[in-house]
Amino acid sequence: MSKEKFQRTKPHVNVGTIGHVDHGKTTLTAAITTVLAKAYGGSARAFDQIDNAPEEKARGITINTSHVEYDTPTRHYAHVDCPGHADYVKNMITGAAQMDGAILVVAATDGPMPQTREHILLGRQVGVPYIIVFMNKCDMVDDEELLELVEMEVRELLSQYDFPGDDTPVIRGSALKALEGDEAWTAKIIELAEALDSYIPEPERAIDKPFLLPIEDVFSISGRGTVVTGRVERGIVKVGEEVEIVGIKDTTKTTCTGVEMFRKLLDEGRAGENVGVLLRGTKRDDVERGQVLAKPGSIKPHTQFESEVYILSKDEGGRHTPFFKGYRPQFYFRTTDVTGTIELPEGVEMVMPGDNIKMVVNLIAPIAMDDGLRFAIREGGRTVGAGVVAKVIA
C-alpha cells in the first residue's frame, strides 16, 4: 500500500518529442516506455501502438496525438508524440498538449533538417521552456568527428532561437537498439530520463501562481452588491483581499467581500473551482464578460502582440479561401471576442487555409494578457484559426 501512496505524490511533468520526420521520435517514445518500465515499473508501449495515434479535437482542430506515461524514481511523466509535422504545429499552437519541456530528436545520420529548425522556432514562439537533445541513430555513425559536428550544429541552432545551446544536455543514443534491449544503448535511455529529471525544473502548480479568474457572468444581488462568476484559472482569492478588474476598460481596484460555490459561502476560491465572487462597491455596469479578476499588478491589458497562428484548412471547417493584409476577424480570448487587424510578415501577401504563420495583431480593445496566452480566430462565431501570444508589444 505504501508504494501506491508514494506514487500519487510524485510531481507530474508534461513532455513531448519534437524533431524532423523519420529521425526516430516515435521509436524513442517506445524505447523510453520500454526501458523505464523495466527499470522502474510502469507499462511499455510498442511502436505501432504509439504510431497509430488517435484523432482528437482541440478548439475545433483535428490533431493526431499519442499520449504515453512513464515514471522515474522521483517523477511521473506524461509524454506526447505526434505522427505528422502538421500535428506538431497544431499541437504546439493550440496548447492542446502543454509541454514543460521537449525532447528534440535529431538523427546523427542527417544532422539538423528543416523541421528540426521549425520545431525549435515553434518551441520558442509558444513558450516551451526547456529542450533536451537526443541524438538518435548513433549506432550508424562510426566517425566520432561527425558526431561532434552534428552536436555542434544542434547547439548552434538552439542558441539561434534563444535556447541555451551550450548548456543543453545532449544524449547520444540509438532508440532502435535500446528498444531491442542492447544494454549499451538502454543505458542511454536511462541517461535521458536522468536529464529530464535534473534539467527540467518541477513546474509551478496553478494554485501557486498569482490569482486570475476570467469573468463569465455578472449579476447584481440587491442589498449585497455585484457578483462575478467564472472558473479560477490560477491562484487563490481570499475574502477581504483587494483584486483588480482588468481588460476592455480602464483597470479598477475592488475588494472581494465573499466567495461562494454551489450556494455555499467559502473563505477562498482556488484554481480549478467554479465560483461567484462578491465585489464591494462595484456597480453591475462596471464589469463585463471578457474581463478578468486578478491579483493587483499581476497582469496588464494589451492591444498589440506578436503571435504564432494556425489557420484551419477547409476540411477542418475553416475558410475556403485565403485572406490578405487588412483582414479583420475576431480574436477570442478566454470568454470573449475582440475585433482586431493583422500585420503579415514582410514578403507575405496572403495566408492559405492550413498554413501556420507569424503575425502581429492589433485589437480594438485591450485584453488582459501574458506571453503564452492562447486564443481562437473567429468569423461570426465560427472558428477559423488558433493562435498563441508569442510576445506582447503594447
From Swiss-Prot:
Query: Which residues are recorded as binding GTP?
Result: 19-26, 81-85, 136-139
The record's region (G1) falls at 19-26
Q: Which residues bind Mg(2+)?
A: 26
In residue numbers, the region (G4) covers 136-139
Its subcellular locations are: Cytoplasm
Record keywords, A-Z: Cytoplasm, Elongation factor, GTP-binding, Hydrolase, Magnesium, Metal-binding, Nucleotide-binding, Protein biosynthesis
The EC category is: hydrolase
What sequence ranges are listed for the domain tr-type G? 10-204
Catalytic activities = GTP + H2O = GDP + phosphate + H(+)
| A GO cellular component entry from the record | cytosol
Region annotation (G5) ranges:
174-176
Q: Which GO terms describe its molecular function?
A: GTP binding; GTPase activity; guanosine tetraphosphate binding; translation elongation factor activity
Report the EC number(s), separated by commas if there are several. Answer: 3.6.5.3
Query: What are the start and end residues of every segment in region (G2)?
Result: 60-64
> Which segments carry the region annotation G3?
81-84
Predominant place of localization: cytoplasm
What job does the chain carry out? GTP hydrolase that promotes the GTP-dependent binding of aminoacyl-tRNA to the A-site of ribosomes during protein biosynthesis.
Similarity annotation: Belongs to the TRAFAC class translation factor GTPase superfamily. Classic translation factor GTPase family. EF-Tu/EF-1A subfamily.
What is known about its subunit structure? Monomer.
Q: What is this protein called?
A: Elongation factor Tu
Protein encoded by which gene: tuf1
